[in-house]
């Protein structure tokens, strides 16, 4: 690819991709949910390029918004959440962005979700490891959008399989995980495992890298470029799983 273009690694099942002059690499499969990953730069930098992507869902890493103070947002000193809502209104899509929220000194890793000009909600990381600087929030959330039911996994919650299991049981069409900096191979491996075990695609977006794991546990898409676009086909499969185990013993009553 020439200068300014983004490379992507795709599954052999897809026959071709397109290189757009705007520098966004789009891989075409069966038409489904078009996802745009922003793995570098701020939201303001991407806000001038959203028309190039024509995506139904835009997923931004933590670098896009950075630090967000609820108090300063309420006082009007900053407008980061408003910027997310405005971008979703202009693009007429769903915008998902990671950020570090501060509520009177309580810092959390969070993900804000907006659709067509409206903030749908903010999801916080629900698990705290070894007394981390970032506090645990409450509740795993699924957002019903025009693009489908999107479940949110915040950062290190990816390490806890119950989060993805909860999203799958509650009917999410896909799990979107916004991470910070990936280790060498741990997070992609976990995304693939949870996609296979829970039966829902896992979209992983972090600094400098994006990945999609399909329900077969395979890497459907991966790219270090920003922004990059992929058409995610909708997949849902159900299987009867039976387990033989000890316990649950009940003796019959006698002497009726």
Predicted regions and their residues:
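Active-site beta-loop-alpha substructure in enzyme catalytic cores
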Residues: 34-60, 64, 134-198
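CN hydrolase (nitrilase-like) catalytic-core segments centered on the catalytic cysteine
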Residues: 76-94, 161-228
């Amino acid at each position: 690819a020439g200068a300014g273009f983004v490379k992507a690694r795709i599954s052999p099942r897809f026959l071709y991709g397109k290189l757009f002059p705007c520098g966004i690499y789009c891989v075409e499969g069966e038409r489904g949910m078009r996802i745009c990953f922003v793995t570098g730069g701020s939201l303001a930098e991407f806000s001038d390029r959203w028309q190039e992507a024509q995506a139904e869902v835009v997923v931004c890493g933590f670098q896009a918004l950075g630090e967000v103070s609820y108090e300063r947002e309420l006082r009007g000193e900053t407008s980061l959440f408003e910027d997310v809502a405005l971008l979703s209104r202009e693009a007429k899509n769903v915008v998902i962005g990671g950020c570090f929220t501060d509520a009177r000194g309580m810092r959390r890793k969070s993900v804000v979700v907006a659709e067509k000009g409206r903030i749908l909600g903010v999801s916080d990381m629900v698990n705290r490891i070894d007394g981390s600087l970032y506090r645990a929030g409450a509740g795993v959330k699924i957002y019903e959008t025009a693009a489908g039911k999107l479940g949110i996994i915040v950062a290190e919650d990816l390490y806890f399989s119950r989060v993805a299991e909860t999203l799958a049981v509650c009917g999410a069409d896909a799990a979107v995980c916004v991470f910070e900096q990936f280790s060498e191979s741990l997070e992609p491996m976990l995304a693939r495992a949870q996609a296979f075990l829970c039966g829902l695609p896992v979209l992983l977006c972090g600094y400098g890298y994006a990945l999609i794991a399909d329900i077969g546990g395979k890497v459907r898409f991966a790219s270090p470029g920003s922004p990059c676009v992929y058409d995610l086909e909708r997949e849902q499969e159900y299987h009867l799983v039976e387990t033989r185990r000890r316990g649950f013993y009940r003796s019959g009553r006698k002497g009726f």
